Amino acid sequence: MRRPSAVDIAVESPLQDEIRVLVAELNAALLALTPPEFCTHMTVEQMANGSTKLFVARADGRAVALGALRRDVDGIGEVKRMYTRPDHQGQGIGGAILAEIEALARRDGLIRLVLETGDRHPAAWRVYERGGFARCGPVLDYPDTGWSVFYEKALA
């Protein structure tokens, strides 16, 4: 996948004010589509633990998108907190972050990536499907509430 020009993607600390703002935007966007009792919002503090790596996309130094890889058990990685600001959507940034997450997962020897997204997020589905992910049943400890769509991708 080609990285959008003028966008740099790197692993960064989630404990930055600018990232807190971006995560708050993500949470608001999710709550507009899904009842709060069915949202699982990983906080920046949770992302700061050793099992999660946060990728941030910056355009002209400004954080415009993010996505995280959380290492689970048995060689499974979970894609978390994927978000692109509306003024940068449709430019391939989400797909580029997803490719970075997958590359890190492969380097770390993970054998499978999984994720949970909302049932009203067709733009997200397209990003995941273009990235080679396939729909599956519930993953990890997520319940099948009817508000979620699950994806997986074998890496090995």
Which ranges hold each PLM region?
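Active-site acidic-Proline motif in GNAT/NAT acetyltransferases
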Residues: R85-D87, Q91, D119
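Acetyl-CoA-dependent GNAT
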Residues: R3-K80, R85-D87, L98-E100, L104, ...
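Charged, amphipathic alpha-helical coiled-coil/dimerization segments
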Residues: Q91, A103, R112-V114
